[in-house]
């Protein structure tokens, strides 16, 4: 993998992980006025990393779908924790197993998009 790509991917994943750390540190997620923006930012950083990884490794036809875990039955905090775990796994696999790294990235994006959809349906208490 070209060093220029790996650094961009690592940076984007690290930013997303940092954002999820901040989300998890919130005492009451339902009252967090910045939750929507933070989730959007984490999802976009993850999407960007996935796009760069996909294009740099010819994975455009590979579209993994998260099926084993019923994410919708989890709390927002647990969903954020799961997304963070997927991102950390992706980062660990990046240099040695890019296809599996991409798979974990796509799973993280799916979890983050699920959280965003739930928040859209169920407004935050501060709204």
Whereabouts are the PLM-identified features?
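Long, charged/polar, soluble alpha-helical segments
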Residues: 1-127
